[in-house]
From Swiss-Prot:
Documented EC number(s): 1.3.1.98
Gene Ontology CC entries for this record: cytosol
Record pathway: Cell wall biogenesis; peptidoglycan biosynthesis
Organism: Synechococcus elongatus (strain ATCC 33912 / PCC 7942 / FACHB-805) (Anacystis nidulans R2)
Annotated FAD-binding PCMH-type domain residues: 24-190
InterPro entries to which the protein is assigned, alphabetical: FAD-bd_PCMH, FAD-bd_PCMH-like_sf, FAD-bd_PCMH_sub1, FAD-bd_PCMH_sub2, MurB, MurB_C, MurB_C_sf, Oxid_FAD_bind_N
Gene encoding the protein: murB
Major localisation: cytoplasm
Family label: Belongs to the MurB family.
Protein name: UDP-N-acetylenolpyruvoylglucosamine reductase
Length: 301
């Protein structure tokens, strides 16, 4: 009973979601909460299930496009669930779901622990990175994840890396039937601190130089159709700078879409579909979005 009372004290209604996403777009959450503990997440999850509400999880709000119409049910923002514990004896790091990935990468580098240098520019949290199998600079979460703690309808469970069925920017967690609350990462301690810091700094500068950080965006919009690069195909179609409303294909990196001020989620989706159609017509390549669509859209063919 105490958990339910506590939830009712923190639960909010009709909360604008644009400020919680890196695109800075999106409508209202029917219900919204920011649980600060695993127990609070479990209570909120159970409440939503009993009410037959869908549950949506947010972290940094990157890699997401939330509809202008908002989201029904309960939105749980896990950004308050932070922290990381480094075990020098084993090289294992226990990380909470809301821990920002760049902060984690810098923390590892400062201790001379290798394995997260690639992640320094990832605009998200640990939970989102685990779900999406985030990656960059030749590394990804699947390389270092050992296990993950999730909340399901059955309660708190521990899943192995094999159970996640990792693939390129994919895991079974994307079905939304489980909520990541923490994960164990296997890193490599004992390196020269200066060496790891140098590699991390180099990766960060490379991302700052080649990717747009000056305007709201979600990170890479499309998966790379290996061995080709989505950005190169989009650029070859002459789409850099192409704009629908205030949504624009970045002139710095064509696999990024920018909110130039007052873009709507629908503008961004329309631009995504235009890019897909143009690349398909020119190269016969079907670009698959890396960004996840949440809510109802008026789709554009």
């Amino acid at each position: 009973m105490t958990g339910a009372v506590s939830l009712l004290e923190t639960l909010q209604q009709a909360v604008p979601l644009a400020g919680f996403t890196s695109f800075r777009v999106g409508g209202l959450a029917q219900f919204y909460d920011e649980p600060a503990s695993v127990e609070a997440i479990a209570t909120a999850w159970q409440w939503a299930r009993l009410a037959d509400f869908p549950v949506t999880f947010l972290g940094a709000g990157s890699n997401l496009l939330i509809s202008d119409r908002g989201l029904p049910g309960l939105v749980l923002n896990l950004r308050r669930l932070q922290g990381a514990t480094f075990d020098l004896a084993t090289g294992c790091v226990e990380v909470a779901a809301g821990e920002p990935i760049p902060r984690l990468a810098w923390a590892a580098a400062r201790q001379g622990w290798s394995g997260l240098e690639w992640a320094v520019g990832i605009p998200g949290t640990l939970g989102g990175a685990v779900v999406m199998n985030a990656g960059a600079q030749g590394g990804c979460m699947a390389d270092i994840l050992q296990s993950v703690q999730v909340i399901t309808d059955q309660g708190l469970e521990t899943w192995s890396r094999e159970q996640l069925q990792y693939d390129y920017r994919h895991s079974v967690l994307q079905t939304g039937h489980a909520c990541v609350v923490s994960a164990q990462l296997q890193l490599q301690p004992g390196f020269e601190r200066s060496q790891v810091l140098t590699t991390t700094s180099t990766n960060f500068r490379q991302r700052k130089r080649t990717q747009p950080y000056h305007l709201p965006n979600c990170g890479s919009v499309f998966r790379n159709p290996e061995p080709q690069k989505a950005g190169q195909l989009i650029e070859a179609c002459g789409l850099k700078g192409y704009q629908i409303g205030d949504a624009q294909v970045s002139e710095l990196h064509a696999n990024f879409i920018l909110n130039c001020g007052a873009a709507r989620a629908q503008d961004i989706l329309s631009l995504i579909r235009h890019v897909q159609g143009t690349v398909g017509d020119h190269f016969g390549v079907n670009l698959h979005p890396e960004v996840k669509l949440l809510g109802e859209f008026q789709d554009v063919i």
